[in-house]
Amino acid sequence: MRIVGIIPARYQSSRFPGKPLVDILGKPMIRHVYERSARAGCLDRLIVATDDARIAAAVAGFGGEALLTRADHASGTDRLAEAARLLELDGADIVVNIQGDEPLVNHRMIEALVEALQCDRHCPMATLAFPSESLQDYNNPNVVKVVLDRGLRALYFSRAPIPFVRDGAADAPAFLKHLGFYAYSASFLQTFSRLPPGRLEGLEKLEQLRALEHGYGIRVALSPVDTRGVDTPEDLEAVVPVLAQDAVGA
């Protein structure tokens, strides 16, 4: 069994075109993601899956491995599934989905994610969550929340404030902020990519709900650190000072 980290990265973005190559402290963002992810001791291989030759060339330029995929994928998960097929992974291999716009990724997050998948044979995929009490995040529909059962399996993901406090407390309850990193068995990744989208997925615009709607369990690991993705130039401004303090993701 191999554990392969795949970083889906596309050049076109409606809110921030070319963001994988945007300079952060002298390096393209994709290099920060790659080098910080490479510190995860559990990974046997790390690859950037992209539809853009410029991104592939940038990755090769700093000594990383890149794989060109089709440009017509509807989601990063579909790109991931194609990459896994091109790599001819065994069904028992583990694929870790590391977002290409997460320059604050920490190797301990990846290690916790892989451990969670390996320890629960009833769940073919795993993801991460970070405990929070931020009222702003609790009420922000762009911050996805997750609730768990007692076995640390996801009951539901939502953009709405969950768990909802019926009695209207002024402060946010302790909740779990979902972090969009995933690990799958390679065989389930192909199964997932072929599943038809579900109604809840369509309403919430959350792809992971597809697994729950089709009856597949998702194990959730508590991340040792929080992170922040880069969707806009404003997000980039916020992550630069954090990276300046922790350039290697110690």
UniProtKB/Swiss-Prot annotation:
GO biological process: CMP-keto-3-deoxy-D-manno-octulosonic acid biosynthetic process; lipopolysaccharide biosynthetic process
InterPro entries: Cytidylyl_trans, KdsB, Nucleotide-diphossugar_trans
Organism: Syntrophobacter fumaroxidans (strain DSM 10017 / MPOB)
Record family assignment: Belongs to the KdsB family.
EC class name: transferase
Annotated EC: 2.7.7.38
Localization in the cell: Cytoplasm
Taxonomy of the source species: Bacteria, Pseudomonadati, Thermodesulfobacteriota, Syntrophobacteria, Syntrophobacterales
Function, as annotated: Activates KDO (a required 8-carbon sugar) for incorporation into bacterial lipopolysaccharide in Gram-negative bacteria.
Any one GO cellular component localisation term in the record: cytosol
Pathway field: Nucleotide-sugar biosynthesis; CMP-3-deoxy-D-manno-octulosonate biosynthesis; CMP-3-deoxy-D-manno-octulosonate from 3-deoxy-D-manno-octulosonate and CTP: step 1/1; Bacterial outer membrane biogenesis; lipopolysaccharide biosynthesis
Keyword terms of this UniProt record: Cytoplasm, Lipopolysaccharide biosynthesis, Nucleotidyltransferase, Transferase
Protein name: 3-deoxy-manno-octulosonate cytidylyltransferase
Reactions the enzyme catalyzes: 3-deoxy-alpha-D-manno-oct-2-ulosonate + CTP = CMP-3-deoxy-beta-D-manno-octulosonate + diphosphate
GO molecular function annotations of the record: 3-deoxy-manno-octulosonate cytidylyltransferase activity
Domain of life: Bacteria
Presence of the UniProt keyword Transferase in the record: yes
Main subcellular location: cytoplasm
Signal peptide: none
HAMAP family (alphabetical): KdsB (MF_00057)
NCBIfam families for this protein: kdsB, PRK05450.1-3, PRK05450.1-5, PRK13368.1
Pfam families: CTP_transf_3
Alphabetical list of Gene3D superfamilies matching this protein: Spore Coat Polysaccharide Biosynthesis Protein SpsA, Chain A
Gene that produces this protein: kdsB
